[in-house]
């Protein structure tokens, strides 16, 4: 499982295993331009909604919102120089273009005052240094993807087992942060990360408060990884008194070389965000199963439920559920082709159909991505 390898290798992308050797290794020679790496990814897809919505829109989806239309999801170019030796400076910049960029663009950068994102984005841009304290204290400053959640925004170094994204990914947690984060490997089993940022998906802060994120990562074995996240801070415009808080739990367990399990749970609330000025709450859980069938073939299943008690996250008070079946084939070492058979269910009639709104939404999708 791609996500499992990322988590188990470092208990989230910010907790690099290179930190464990940072103190013992001598400083790396400054190789200048030769040390800079270039990577990339191209993802394209097609989705068909069996409800036949007149607007040709898949309701409540994160990225796969276009019905009956071929789409360029994202083109990504990453330029980076990893830092691993004490006091060695590094950086990473992710340039993206496509439909994904329009959704995840941060306010204050490629999202205008009306809230409309553009088809280009500076997905990540940060500088890094490893301070020679203990096993190595890693410091990152700039813009980076969130450390919350089981699923990721697809990139050259990580993508999900399912082609579509969960409700938890889209509505329970943020996409990116801009600020400062420090991470430290206490032992091969326990890692920590602390971040202070402007907020959720903001390059320019919308109030005078800051958002704080604490992460604990546990890797009891090479096959099991558990991440606990807590994030809190004011996120409303010109309001630093009312906080948004989320507790996020992620676990992956590789039972065998062919069978992997995953879990994600989120519990969130926000003061003064419910109708009437009360506290809004949302929660959900998702389960994942991936089975390597044979050779380049694999099959993944995701099932989840998400309760938006007050409608603060989806716009209407409802409980959403979905199940997704994803067959996959790898064409060589750089190309992945995935199908996506998905059924969304709500306790409210929120899904557009040919003659009105329904409580279910079945879709069929295909996705191809190439990375280097």
Residue ranges: model-predicted function:
Residues 30-58, 70, 91, 224, ...:
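Transmembrane beta-strand segments of Gram-negative outer membrane beta-barrel proteins
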Residues 14-21:
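C-terminal segment of classical bacterial N-terminal signal peptides
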Residues 63-100:
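Glycine- and aromatic-enriched membrane insertion/assembly motifs of diderm outer-membrane
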Residues 33, 82-86, 132-135, 146, ...:
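Outer-membrane beta-barrel channels and translocator barrels
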Residues 40, 44, 72, 76-81, ...:
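Residues on the lipid-exposed face of transmembrane beta-strands in outer-membrane beta-barrel proteins
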Residues 61-64, 101-104, 110-116, 224-372:
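Outer-membrane beta-barrel pore domains
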Residues 43-47, 94-98, 144-146, 195-200, ...:
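Outer-membrane beta-barrel pore domains and translocons
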Residues 48-70, 100-217, 227-234:
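Surface-exposed coil loops of outer-membrane beta-barrel proteins
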């Amino acid at each position: 499982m791609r996500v499992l390898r990322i988590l188990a290798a470092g208990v989230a992308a910010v907790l690099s295993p290179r930190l464990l050797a940072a103190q013992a290794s001598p400083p790396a020679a400054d190789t200048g331009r030769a040390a800079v790496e270039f990577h990339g990814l191209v993802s394209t897809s097609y989705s068909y909604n069996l409800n036949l919505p007149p607007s040709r829109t898949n309701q409540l989806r994160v990225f796969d919102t276009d019905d009956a239309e071929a789409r360029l999801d994202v083109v990504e170019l990453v330029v980076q120089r990893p830092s691993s030796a004490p006091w060695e400076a590094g950086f990473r910049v992710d340039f993206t273009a496509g439909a994904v960029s329009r959704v995840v663009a941060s306010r204050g950068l490629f999202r205008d005052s009306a809230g409309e994102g553009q088809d280009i984005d500076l997905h990540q841009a940060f500088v890094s240094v490893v301070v020679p304290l203990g096993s190595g204290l890693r410091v990152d400053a700039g813009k980076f993807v969130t450390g919350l959640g089981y699923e990721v925004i697809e990139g050259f170094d990580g993508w999900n087992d399912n082609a579509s994204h969960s409700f938890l990914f889209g509505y329970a947690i943020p996409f990116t942060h801009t600020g400062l984060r420090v991470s430290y490997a206490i032992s091969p089993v326990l890692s920590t990360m602390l971040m202070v940022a402007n907020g959720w998906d903001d390059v320019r802060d919308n109030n005078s408060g800051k958002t704080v994120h604490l992460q604990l990562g546990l890797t009891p074995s090479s096959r099991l990884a558990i991440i606990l996240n807590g994030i809190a801070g004011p996120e409303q415009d010109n309001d630093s008194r009312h906080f948004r808080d989320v507790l996020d739990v992620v676990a992956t367990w590789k039972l065998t070389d062919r069978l992997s399990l995953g879990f994600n749970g989120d519990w969130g609330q926000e003061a003064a965000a419910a109708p009437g000025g009360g506290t809004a709450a949302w929660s959900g859980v998702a389960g994942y199963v991936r089975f390597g069938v044979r050779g380049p073939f694999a099959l993944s299943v995701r099932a989840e439920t998400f309760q938006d008690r007050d409608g603060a996250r989806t716009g209407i008070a409802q409980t959403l559920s979905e199940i997704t079946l994803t067959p996959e084939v790898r064409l060589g070492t750089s190309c992945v082709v995935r199908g996506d058979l998905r059924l969304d269910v709500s306790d409210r009639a929120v899904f557009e159909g040919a003659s009105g709104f329904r409580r279910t939404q079945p879709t069929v999708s295909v996705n191809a991505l190439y990375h280097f």
